[in-house]
């Protein structure tokens, strides 16, 4: 049996949008879907029947969600899973055997910030994580992927290229960074210091996309090098008109202890469009 797309569902509008996005993807890729709903048992007291009540409420919620999902894509096999406690922990655990985890942005407005639980899922999942908001997708086109020379970014490009080729979309590979302030470079012997840095990063960008033309001969790839904008800001701007944004779980500047890098975190908290954290396989770091 194919690995399922696991969807965290609750009663928020963004969760409904996430379920719709996941169902469409599942139908296209011929994958099953598992709807996971977590009930809050922090105030559970058997003496007042709370446990039974929240469980029954959760069962009813999942049954209704399954019915709505079936109407969205009748050909997709949908199962449900009711869990107690934190949604972040439950989805993270199920990500080990999932094709993808899909969650809503956590709030009822487009571009709204993520809840702590949603960020937790994005940080600990062992598979790609799609975060979906209530964005108007009219007139949006193209897939954008952020790169920085890290192994995570290379995996993100591989994922984004496959998505763009499958969907018939153009791919924009964006490498953004800020060159050092003038006061930082005082005393540096190279008079063309900024040019040297820029050229080195241009090579990083070129190496990141190397091989895509051979693997996807019909894929249109745009390489963008931005030396005047912080990575997160550049990705947010590019994602504002994109159909999909793909980022790595963390970049080359992240500490080993961080499960979610600062750029990915910043992008998710201001979600510009459907965004995927492309965690494909574990990457070992020496730092």
Each language-model region and where it sits:
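A short acidic, glycine-rich active-site loop
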Residues: 51-60, 191-203
């Amino acid at each position: 049996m194919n690995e399922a797309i696991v969807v965290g569902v609750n009663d928020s509008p963004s969760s409904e949008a996430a379920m719709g996005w996941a169902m469409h993807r599942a139908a296209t890729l011929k994958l099953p879907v598992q709807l996971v709903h977590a009930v809050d048992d922090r105030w559970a007291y058997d003496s007042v029947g709370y446990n039974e009540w929240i469980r029954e409420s959760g069962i009813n919620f999942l049954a209704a969600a399954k019915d709505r999902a079936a109407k969205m894509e009748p050909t997709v096999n949908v199962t449900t899973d009711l869990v107690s406690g934190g949604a972040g922990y439950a989805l993270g655990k199920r990500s080990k055997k999932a094709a993808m985890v899909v969650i809503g942005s956590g709030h009822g407005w487009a571009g709204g910030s993520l809840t702590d639980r949603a960020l937790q899922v994005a940080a600990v999942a062992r598979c790609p994580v799609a975060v979906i908001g209530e964005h108007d997708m009219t007139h949006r086109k193209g897939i954008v992927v952020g790169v920085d020379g890290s192994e995570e970014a290379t995996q993100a490009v591989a994922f984004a290229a496959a998505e763009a080729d499958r969907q018939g979309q153009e791919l924009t590979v964006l490498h953004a960074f800020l060159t050092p302030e003038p006061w930082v470079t005082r005393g540096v012997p190279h008079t063309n210091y900024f040019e040297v840095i820029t050229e080195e990063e241009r090579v990083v960008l070129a190496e990141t996309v190397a091989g895509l033309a051979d693997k996807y001969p019909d894929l249109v790839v745009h390489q963008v090098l931005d030396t005047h904008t912080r990575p997160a800001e550049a990705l947010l701007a590019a994602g504002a008109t994109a159909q999909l944004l793909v980022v790595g779980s963390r970049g080359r500047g992240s500490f080993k202890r961080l499960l979610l890098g600062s750029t990915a975190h910043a992008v998710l908290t201001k979600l510009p469009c459907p965004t995927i954290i492309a965690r494909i396989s574990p990457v070992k770091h020496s730092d």
